Amino acid sequence: IEVGDWSSDVCSSDLATALSREVLASVGRAVVGKREELELVLAAVLAGGHVLLEDFPGLGKTLAARSFAQALGLEFTRAQFTPDLLPGDLTGSFLFDPRRQEFSFREGPLFTNLLLADEVNRTPPKTQAALLEAMQEGQITVEGTTFPLARPFHVIATANPVEHEGTYRLPEAQLDRFLARLSFGYPDAQEEWSVLDRRIARRREEQTVPRAADAADLLAAQEAVETVRVDPSVGRYCVALAAATRGHRAVRLGASPRGSLALVLLARALAVIRGRDYIAPEDVKAVAVPALAHRISIRPELWMTSVTGADVVREVLSGTPVPGARP
């Protein structure tokens, strides 16, 4: 199937599965390994959400974001978040045209299909708020005038761990707007050699990946994801997982209902990537940490114990009955 054919008529879940595999194969030509993490990034995009890649520098976060934009055929913009970045640097601003004697609006980097918000936690909260409106509402407001953003619109943000010098802790409201938070981690020895080998063979730094879809294809695939069946027992399992985080002894603030919704949305998309038109409990388990961990606040007195939101989610997973499983 050629680019642009996926969206012809109504995209079924089978076509969305085929599109997903084409996109992942394309991205895999640039990003070595990390298949599970790449599947989760694509699942978040297919579910219509935004992704936070939180990891140390040099582990392929920016490369992955750019590769997905190329493979999906989306208009791509990169914004480098720095301590002196202003909201207008993201949204755009009104400029006076002396020839026409009027103000005209100059669009900022938010006017795109896929925004790479690089090192998003290095900019002050005021600028982060401008990004939050775009993520939450799909629009921006400049001097009282509202501008709708393009569809599809997705943010892939990268962040360094908060222990790094010069970082601002992302506010809970903004973290909650990311459908998933992921970490690639360090590659193993074979993967790291593959990175070097590819670079040596290429003889240049830049690399591009083949386009596997376009914006219309992505929108059609997102509609197909909405048709994935959710059994009530699996839906209640998602609710039980989110609710269990609120009652955990180490948690100050557990996952909100948006967390249980994120579980369903991500699990739906992952089911499509895996070739099914229904959610299985295994899909929910696979997305639980990326969907819930960043929505959990640990009690301050436990900050020095290295307990994380991911630890809480894993403990909740092990203690919550799985649908269809015997007690």
Label for each model-derived stretch:
Residues A71-R99:
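AAA+/P-loop NTPase substrate/partner-engagement loops
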Residues R299-P327:
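Terminal-proximal interaction/regulatory segments of ATP-powered molecular machines
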Residues V45-T82:
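Walker A/P-loop
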Residues I200-M304, G309-A310:
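Basic, amphipathic alpha-helical bundle interface domains used for macromolecular binding and assembly
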Residues L15-L59, V239:
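Pre-Walker A (pre-P-loop) alpha-helix and adjacent loop at the N terminus of AAA/AAA+ ATPase modules
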Residues D97-E102, R122-T127, M135-V228, R268-I273:
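Canonical AAA+ ATPase core
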Residues I1-C11:
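Single conserved hydrophobic/aromatic residue that forms the stacking wall/gate
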Residues E39-A43, F96-L116, T145:
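Conserved alpha-helical scaffold flanking the Walker A/P-loop in AAA+ ATPase domains
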